[in-house]
């Protein structure tokens, strides 16, 4: 292993019940089929594949108020939290292949149980910070951040399946990038808690270079700490990731997405990565599915050091001919 190589633990989370559309549970399968593990190994990373979690059906999972599938989502996240904690205890960077974005509850909880001073970068068209009481859809993939924030303790009712969750990050520990579809209740929460965000307006105004400079300065300025990148592929414009459940026009470009992941890699502090909401059933054509999957793979590889300028091994490529 070279000095740049990382120890990575990959866990698939084929789960879809945080939202209504079938197919997102196939995310781990299509990402693996695209050669993600082989491509990481080509970069001389030490990759351990922990396989895919298996989620049991939860009978009689009646809604809580309007929140759908609460027990299934709660239980799946508890399983994922345990798996991610195990990967972190083994000294590896956790790579979670989703699945819908409700799984960030488990991924970040498990990560924070081992690395408590976590910083979270959340790339998404949405803030995913509705509470079970502010949600208008009842879909838990729009609520994960509300379960994770200490400041919202007391604002979250006792949802069946979630008794294991302890809020593990503060409002000052998270930065959003790519926002462009935020509910009024979510906007109120983000503003009231003073959460740092770069909506597409700020990305347009500042450019992605400045956005990343400010993001990393804000999260790491006082001290270096582990970074958890939770990447919803709908953060990118639907022209690059069409096969996803809640696409919103006017998103991050492919180049901006890659720049975000390159900048995080360069800190040397990436400690956990979620690649979420790839849904192969929602591509209108096979090409749309391929485009989405290839983009998700490229974002992952850039997070682990694949650079657009090229990469080379630490050898002398110019040794004289024999």
From Swiss-Prot:
Pathway: Nitrogen metabolism; urea cycle; L-ornithine and urea from L-arginine: step 1/1. Mn(2+) 1 binds at residues 101, 124, 128, 232. It catalyses: L-arginine + H2O = urea + L-ornithine. InterPro entries: Arginase, Ureohydrolase, Ureohydrolase_dom_sf, Ureohydrolase_Mn_BS. Keywords: Arginine metabolism, Cytoplasm, Hydrolase, Manganese, Metal-binding, Phosphoprotein, Urea cycle. The keyword Hydrolase applies. Its cofactor is Mn(2+). Mn(2+) 2 binds at residues 124, 126, 232, 234. GO terms for biological process: arginine catabolic process to ornithine; urea cycle. Residues 1-26 are annotated as: Disordered. Its EC number is 3.5.3.1. NCBIfam families: rocF_arginase. This is Arginase-1. It comes from Oryctolagus cuniculus. The lineage of its organism: Eukaryota, Metazoa, Chordata, Craniata, Vertebrata.
């Amino acid at each position: 292993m070279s000095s740049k190589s990382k120890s990575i633990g990959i866990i698939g989370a084929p789960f879809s019940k945080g939202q209504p559309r079938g197919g997102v549970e196939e995310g781990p399968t299509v990402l693996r089929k695209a050669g993600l593990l082989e491509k990481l190994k080509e970069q001389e990373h030490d990759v351990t594949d922990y396989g895919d979690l298996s989620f049991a059906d939860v009978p009689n999972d009646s809604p809580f108020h309007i929140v759908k599938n609460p027990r299934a989502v709660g239980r799946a996240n508890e399983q994922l939290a345990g798996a991610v904690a195990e990967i972190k205890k083994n000294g590896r960077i956790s790579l979670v292949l989703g699945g819908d974005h409700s799984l960030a509850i488990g991924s970040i909880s498990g990560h924070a149980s081992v690395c408590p001073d976590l910083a979270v970068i959340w790339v998404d068209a949405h803030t995913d910070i509705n509470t079970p009481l502010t949600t208008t859809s009842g879909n838990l993939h729009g609520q994960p951040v509300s379960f994770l924030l200490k400041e919202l303790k007391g604002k979250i009712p006792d949802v069946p399946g979630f008794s294991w969750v302890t809020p593990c990050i503060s409002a000052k520990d998270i930065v959003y990038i790519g926002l462009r579809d935020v509910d009024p209740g979510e906007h109120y929460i983000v503003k009231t808690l003073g959460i740092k965000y770069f909506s597409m307006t700020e990305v347009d105004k500042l450019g992605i270079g400045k956005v990343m400079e400010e993001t990393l300065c804000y999260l790491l300025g006082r001290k270096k700490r582990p970074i958890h990148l939770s990447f919803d592929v709908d953060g990118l414009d639907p022209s690059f990731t069409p096969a996803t459940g809640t696409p919103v026009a006017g998103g991050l470009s492919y180049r901006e997405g890659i720049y975000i992941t390159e900048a995080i890699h360069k800190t040397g502090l990436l400690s956990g990565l979620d690649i979420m909401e790839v849904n192969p059933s929602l591509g209108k054509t096979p090409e749309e599915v391929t485009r989405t999957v290839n983009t998700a793979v490229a974002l992952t590889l850039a997070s682990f050091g694949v650079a657009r300028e090229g990469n080379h091994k630490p050898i002398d490529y110019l040794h004289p001919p024999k």
